[in-house]
């Protein structure tokens, strides 16, 4: 077998010997019959003076016969063609070596980097990088792939950031693709055209036309190069159109129909409002129209600015409607604003709970002594000094009664508590004692419903007269000036419904009353509890606004020195006053957002039913009284059971 291979190699060498004697004019013949392909490659490399590397996957035999002779260059191309027939390709390496590989692996093994000065010839495997100037590489690459033979070696890829094509394949095929690229990558017939608009807005028309072009691309898959590009110049109210001649002609024809003067007929509309107040919207819409006039005034010619100046907005309070006179574009924008403002505003039910509990007690106890010869032990803070009491008793014994002239008259009239004693001879003793216990429970639950961002107030109380001044006239007549102060429960609230279910509440809460325990001669004393703040509360939740926990304790002792300190006996020489009070005050708030009629109706029915039940319980409690309860008024049970009337149509 080894001898046979040697014979075959010798025959191949003989067949591939040059037919002429001069190297520069060497002619080669090629006749192979069932020759080993690897040995064939080695022999060709020897005659071409090339180092050829053979991939291990290259195996098999070849058979070819040629009746012509070739030059060295023709012989090399013949060598490449033979390998191509058997599914192999030759790659030129950077160091000048040749490498024989399977054609299927050529896509992952780029060939010699060729250019216009060294493009490669024939079946030589090359790679060309072609930059494009006028055509997007992304659009051209798929077309070039279709022009390559289905079974040919090579590939076409694009790199979009640099807008280049990377071509790999046989030099003959790549050179043909280069010719195609040169013919396609040329500056088209695009030109720029400026169209000045007389009536329409350049920005508005540019937006409309670009939208039409975009939609036509989506439906017909029209290439971007064949369509027009439109840019608006706001300063000159012009459109700059670039693109092919036919595309520009279509846009120009369309602009002739769009850039026309708007008709002034039928530009007055009446908008009937459902929720908003017409008089309140006039100022808002006037501001919007002025803004539109400022934005578009500079973009329009003087001949077309008159329509913008003739904007009139009037409110009709009787029908709660708006009468607007303006051109079509302004009408559409104002109609959009009206639709967003004329909406049903949310309402808020605000319920406040004021709880106050007061508990106090006091004890006043004292003993006073008096002697005509020695002196007295007197405590004036008891409200009944012993000297005044002794003088009153003496006048009583002398006159047989007590009159307003008696010095003890005023003291005994204003004194609260027990007073006991005796006045006999030179001695007198007076015992005063008073125990007090005060309790006060207050529970107020004011509630009110108001619109979003609308101030609402609630006031339940009395007007109490307060003496503010007194003047004596020339005829000794006294002229008094009286002011009235409202006491009771006051609630002021402004709700603001935020995104979601949160409510911002600005609250002023006051609970006031007249202090009945005060004995001031200057006028009544008022108890006032006031809170003013802003809170953010979620709908339906009860939160505390503020509160006060007050614990008051006071003890006062008046005594005779030394004698008052004697155990037990010292009680006869002292006056003791003890006072203690506790007060707990808390204020709560609960908002409920009302967005529709069903929620409002449900809340109203709940409160109506609760108060009716309380009223019914009171009437039932009076059924056994002497006065009959059958004629007492009571809330109707079926008020919320009847259907609400149908809304009237305008």
Curated annotation (Swiss-Prot):
Induction profile: Silenced by the DNA-binding protein H-NS under standard growth conditions.
Domain notes: The N0, N1, N2 and N3 domains are periplasmic, while the secretin and S domains form a channel that is partially inserted in the outer membrane. The N1, N2 and N3 domains each form a periplasmic ring; the N0 domain was present but not resolved by electron microscopy. The secretin domain forms a double beta-barrel structure; the outer barrel has a diameter of about 110 Angstroms while the inner barrel forms the central gate with a small pore in the closed state.
Name used for this protein in its record: Putative secretin GspD
A GO CC term attached to the entry: type II protein secretion system complex
Signal peptide: 1-23
Task of the protein: Involved in a type II secretion system (T2SS, formerly general secretion pathway, GSP) for the export of folded proteins across the outer membrane. This subunit would form the outer membrane channel.
Site (May serve as a pivot that allows opening of the central gate for substrate egress): 461
Keywords (A to Z) from UniProt: Cell outer membrane, Membrane, Protein transport, Signal, Transmembrane, Transmembrane beta strand, Transport
Molecular function via GO: identical protein binding
Oligomer and partners: Forms a cylindrical channel with 15 subunits; approximately 25% of the particles have 16-subunit channels. Closed pentadeacameric channels are 180 Angstroms long and 145 Angstroms in diameter. Each subunit turns in a clock-wise manner around the channel.
Compartments (UniProt record): Cell outer membrane
Annotated region described as N0, given as residue ranges: 24-122
Swiss-Prot/TrEMBL GO biological process terms: protein secretion; protein secretion by the type II secretion system
Family that this chain belongs to: Belongs to the bacterial secretin family. GSP D subfamily.
Residue numbers spanned by region S domain: 598-650
Pfam families recorded: Secretin, Secretin_N, type_II_gspD_N0
Region (N3): 266-342
Misc remark: Part of a cryptic operon that encodes proteins involved in type II secretion machinery in other organisms, but is not expressed in strain K12.
Region (Secretin) residue spans: 345-596
Residue ranges, annotated region (N2): 189-263
Tagged with keyword RNA-binding: no
């Amino acid at each position: 077998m080894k001898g046979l291979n040697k014979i075959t190699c010798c025959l191949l060498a003989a067949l591939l010997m040059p037919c002429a004697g001069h190297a520069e004019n060497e002619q080669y013949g090629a006749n192979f019959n069932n020759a080993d392909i690897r040995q064939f490659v080695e022999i060709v490399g020897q005659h071409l003076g090339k180092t050829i590397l053979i991939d291990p996957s290259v195996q098999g035999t070849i058979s070819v016969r040629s009746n012509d002779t070739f030059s060295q260059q023709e012989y090399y191309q013949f060598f490449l063609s033979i390998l191509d027939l058997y599914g192999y390709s030759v790659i030129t390496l950077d160091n000048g070596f040749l490498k024989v590989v399977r054609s299927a692996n050529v896509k992952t093994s780029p060939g010699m980097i060729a250019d216009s000065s060294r493009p490669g010839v024939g079946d030589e495997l090359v790679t060309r990088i072609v930059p494009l100037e006028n055509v997007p590489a992304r659009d051209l690459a798929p077309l070039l792939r279709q022009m390559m033979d289905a079974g040919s070696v090579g590939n076409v890829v694009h790199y979009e950031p640099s807008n280049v094509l990377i071509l790999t394949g046989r030099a003959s095929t790549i050179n043909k693709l280069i010719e195609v690229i040169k013919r396609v990558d040329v500056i088209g017939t695009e030109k720029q055209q400026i169209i000045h608009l007389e009536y329409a807005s350049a920005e508005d028309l540019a937006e409309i036309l670009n939208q039409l072009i975009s939609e036509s691309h989506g439906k017909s898959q029209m290439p971007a190069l064949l369509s027009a590009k439109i840019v608006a110049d706001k300063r000159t109210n012009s459109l700059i159109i670039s693109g092919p001649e036919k595309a520009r002609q279509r846009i120009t024809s369309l602009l002739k129909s769009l850039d026309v003067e708007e008709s002034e007929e039928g530009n007055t509309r009446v908008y009937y409002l459902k929720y908003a107040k017409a008089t309140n919207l006039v100022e808002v819409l006037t501001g919007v129209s002025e803004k539109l006039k400022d934005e578009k005034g500079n973009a329009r010619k003087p001949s077309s600015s008159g329509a913008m100046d003739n904007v009139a907005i009037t409110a009709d309070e009787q029908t709660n409607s708006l009468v607007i006179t303006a051109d079509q574009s302004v009408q559409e924008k104002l109609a959009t604003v009206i639709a967003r403002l004329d909406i049903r505003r949310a309402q808020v039910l605000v319920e406040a709970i004021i709880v106050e509990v007061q508990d106090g007690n006091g004890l006043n106890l004292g003993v006073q002594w008096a002697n005509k010869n020695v002196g007295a032990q007197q405590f004036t803070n008891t409200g009944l000094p012993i000297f005044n009491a002794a003088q009153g008793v003496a006048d009583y014994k002398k006159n047989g009664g007590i009159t307003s002239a008696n010095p003890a008259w005023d003291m005994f009239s204003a004194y609260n508590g027990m007073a006991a004693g005796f006045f006999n001879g030179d001695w007198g003793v007076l015992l005063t004692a008073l125990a007090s216990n005060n309790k006060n429970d207050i529970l107020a639950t004011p509630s009110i419903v108001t619109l979003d961002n609308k101030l609402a107030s609630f006031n339940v109380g009395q007007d109490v007269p307060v003496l503010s001044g007194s003047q004596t006239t020339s005829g000794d007549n006294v002229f008094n000036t009286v002011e009235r102060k409202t006491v009771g429960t006051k609630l002021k609230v402004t709700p603001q419904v935020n995104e979601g279910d949160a409510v911002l509440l600005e609250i002023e809460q006051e609970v006031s009353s007249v202090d009945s325990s005060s004995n001031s001669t200057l006028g009544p004393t008022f108890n006032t509890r006031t809170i003013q703040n802003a809170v953010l509360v979620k709908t339906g939740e009860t939160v505390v606004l503020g509160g006060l926990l007050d614990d008051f304790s006071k003890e006062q002792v008046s005594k005779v020195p030394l004698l008052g300190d004697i155990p037990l006996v010292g009680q006869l020489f002292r006056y003791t006053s003890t006072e203690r009070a506790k007060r707990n005050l808390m204020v709560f708030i609960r908002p409920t957002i009302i967005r529709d009629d069903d929620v409002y109706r449900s809340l109203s029915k709940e409160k109506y039913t609760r108060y009716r039940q309380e009223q019914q319980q009171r009437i039932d409690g009076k059924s056994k009284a002497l006065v009959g309860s059958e004629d007492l008024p009571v809330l109707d049970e079926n008020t919320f059971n009847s259907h609400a009337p149908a809304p009237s149509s305008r």
